[in-house]
Amino acid sequence: MNRIALYTGSFDPLTNGHLDVITSAASICDELVVGIGAHPSKAPLFSVDERAALIDRSCRDFLKERSCRLSVQPFFGLAVEAARAAGARILIRGLRNGSDFDYEAQMAGMNAAMAPEIRTVFFVASPGVGHITATLVRQIAAMGGDVSHFVPQPVLRALEAKSKTDG
């Protein structure tokens, strides 16, 4: 049986916290679809195409070692509809703290009501990454701070390149 899971987020940028969830998800599925939420009204740091390339470069090799195929695609609208379109029966969510759990448990309940065939699986953040958020990474990087402990190398290089062109 081909187990397909969908992990959605903005991934702007991809962080080591996201990688932690992706690594955990790879242990329970044969194919992981990373769905990049595309919101036309928001002004992201990286375009959807840039984020997709960064996710691919950051994840492809280590997922191959785990026999998990990776695909990255944008999605608009509801995560359960994106899961259905991808053939996924599992939604992956990461939890950093109790606040995340409260929100994600409500979302899982709503998703189950809309799509009972799709299950939500939660992965609790590893101790070393529970404090990382993409918002804080963007803010620290914008102020010239060192984010090397918070993002994978391809993302770090992209942030550095962006700061040179924007600064």
Curated annotation (Swiss-Prot):
GO BP: coenzyme A biosynthetic process
Record-listed substrate binding positions: S10, K42, A79, R93
InterPro entries according to UniProt: Cyt_trans-like, PPAT, Rossmann-like_a/b/a_fold
Positions bearing the site annotation: Transition state stabilizer: H18
Cysteine disulfide partners in this protein: none
Protein's cellular compartments: Cytoplasm
Enzymatic class: transferase
Record's keyword terms, sorted: ATP-binding, Coenzyme A biosynthesis, Cytoplasm, Magnesium, Nucleotide-binding, Nucleotidyltransferase, Transferase
Cofactor(s) required, per the database record: Mg(2+)
Keyword Nucleotidyltransferase: yes
GO cellular component: cytoplasm
Gene Ontology terms, MF aspect: ATP binding; pantetheine-phosphate adenylyltransferase activity
EC number: 2.7.7.3
Binding residues for ATP: S10, F11, H18, G94, L95, R96, E104, V129, G130, H131, I132, T133, A134, T135
Presence of the UniProt keyword Nucleotide-binding in the record: yes
HAMAP family the record matches: PPAT_bact (MF_00151)
Full protein name: Phosphopantetheine adenylyltransferase
Source organism phylogeny: Bacteria, Pseudomonadati, Pseudomonadota, Alphaproteobacteria, Hyphomicrobiales
